[in-house]
């Protein structure tokens, strides 16, 4: 099936499906969930279900029964809503400039002008305003993840050393995995745990009966990748817990694990493929300078933005970036003219990296908002670097941090969901 533009946009930018415009399925709308003081309607749910079906079909995955998918998508929408409400309560706001840049990037990636993007979206029944709203939602959740979770994740030298030792014993094998997660709430009682255990074993029975893993994942999994067939992509041995690597070493390609109980809930994993990872580890590195104006109780968002605009104006009129960094930057790199040295992807927060990689060498960015404040960025160089020897430890640390970030974020979202007031009315007619 030929993918729509929307599916391409999802694949290139979003981690979850972009919502299509609400298309009434019934003449009378109704509330299907209450999340604190907000509601999710039947028509909103149906629009997201329709988009989920398109996404699955684009992956050549047969969707589960619609009523099953409705329940899965509704839970996704509830989880999104509690995060968006939390962000709003903390004053987290995505500026229009960030949305403008994301739209421009989408058009560029698909080799379209803005007018061409509008026209192509219209063919898929999507307005540009709706796309912008979806992008704003995804950027909000992404920034929330960084501000609430990233600062709490640490990786010790001993963890890195142990991972490298394990990788050597595993001959640097890489694994392509898929997963099904039946999440267990933090304060679940024995009855809830038993019900969830029955759910995951029903999923296991469907797999044993020959149902495709991707279809079972879409029907049962609570993980964000459920509607992507549970696909986790390629994972190196260093990015996985040692006990799990030992299990994978004994499995054949195509096999599923038994049900595995973890702190998050019940997992079933599929070993889709595996390969030797002994080739050189080439990473793209960037050499940026930056100027940071922080926001805090004494400096408002508007004041910080005005200050960074003034600094940029001086640079555009001929002032040297390094001199301005020494004078105005509120980062520890100011003494070095804002020089951050050579950095790898994953070293910096996503908003900074996204702006950095799009900049031509020698060009000063527009102001960039991150959880730390407002930045100006100047890229002085970029290169591909082999990190398989001297810099392997750095790469391993990044992999471990990414895994711990994923788990910490999942745990944090679960706690946020459990603490919210949620009423579901999907079964009410």
From Swiss-Prot:
Residue ranges annotated for the PpiC domain, each copy included: 172-273, 283-381
E.C. numbers: 5.2.1.8
Catalytic activity: [protein]-peptidylproline (omega=180) = [protein]-peptidylproline (omega=0)
GO molecular function list: peptide binding; peptidyl-prolyl cis-trans isomerase activity; unfolded protein binding
Gene3D superfamilies per the UniProt record, alphabetical: 3.10.50.40, Porin chaperone SurA, peptide-binding domain (1.10.4030.10)
Alphabetized UniProt keyword annotations: Chaperone, Isomerase, Periplasm, Repeat, Rotamase, Signal
Domain notes: The PPIase activity resides only in the second parvulin domain. The N-terminal region and the C-terminal tail are necessary and sufficient for the chaperone activity of SurA. The PPIase activity is dispensable for SurA to function as a chaperone. The N-terminal region and the C-terminal tail are also required for porin recognition.
Name of the protein in its database record: Chaperone SurA
Organism: Chromobacterium violaceum (strain ATCC 12472 / DSM 30191 / JCM 1249 / CCUG 213 / NBRC 12614 / NCIMB 9131 / NCTC 9757 / MK)
């Amino acid at each position: 099936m030929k993918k729509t533009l929307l599916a391409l946009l999802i694949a290139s930018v979003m981690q979850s499906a972009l919502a299509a415009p609400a298309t009434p399925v019934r003449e009378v709308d109704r509330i299907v969930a209450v999340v604190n003081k907000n509601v999710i309607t039947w028509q909103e749910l149906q629009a997201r279900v329709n988009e989920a079906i398109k996404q699955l079909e684009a992956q050549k995955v047969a969707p589960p029964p619609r009523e099953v998918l409705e329940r899965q998508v509704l839970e996704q929408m509830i989880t999104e809503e509690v995060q968006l409400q939390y962000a709003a309560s903390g004053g987290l706001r995505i500026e229009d400039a960030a949305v403008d840049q994301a739209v421009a990037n989408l058009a560029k990636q698909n080799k379209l002008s803005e007018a061409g993007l509008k026209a192509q979206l219209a063919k898929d029944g999507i307005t540009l305003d709706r796309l912008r709203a979806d992008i704003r939602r995804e950027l909000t959740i992404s920034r929330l993840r960084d501000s609430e979770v990233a600062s709490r994740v640490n990786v010790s030298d001993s963890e890195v050393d142990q991972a490298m030792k394990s990788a050597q014993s595993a001959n640097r094998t890489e694994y392509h995995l898929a997963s099904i997660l039946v999440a267990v709430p933090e304060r679940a009682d024995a009855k809830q745990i038993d019900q969830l255990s029955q759910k995951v074993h029903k999923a296991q029975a469907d797999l044993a009966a020959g149902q495709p893993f991707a279809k079972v994942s879409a029907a049962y999994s609570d993980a964000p990748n459920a509607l992507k067939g549970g696909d986790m992509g390629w994972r190196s041995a260093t990015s996985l817990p040692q006990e799990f690597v030992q299990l994978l070493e004994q499995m054949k390609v195509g096999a599923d694990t038994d049900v595995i109980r973890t702190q998050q809930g019940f997992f079933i994993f599929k070993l889709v493929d595996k390969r030797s990872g002994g080739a050189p580890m080439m990473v793209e590195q960037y050499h940026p300078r930056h100027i940071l104006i922080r926001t805090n109780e004494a400096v408002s968002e508007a004041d910080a933005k005005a200050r960074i605009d003034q600094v940029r104006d001086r640079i555009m009129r001929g002032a040297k970036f390094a001199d301005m960094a020494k004078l105005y930057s509120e980062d520890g790199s100011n003494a070095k003219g804002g020089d951050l040295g050579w950095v790898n992807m994953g070293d910096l927060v996503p908003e900074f990296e996204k702006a950095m990689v799009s900049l031509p060498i020698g060009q000063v960015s527009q102001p960039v908002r991150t959880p730390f404040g407002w930045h100006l960025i100047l890229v002085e160089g970029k290169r591909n670097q082999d990190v398989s020897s001297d810099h392997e430890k750095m790469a391993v640390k990044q992999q471990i941090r990414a895994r711990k970030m994923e788990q910490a974020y999942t745990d944090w979202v679960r706690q946020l969901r459990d603490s919210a007031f949620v009423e579901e009315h999907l079964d009410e007619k």
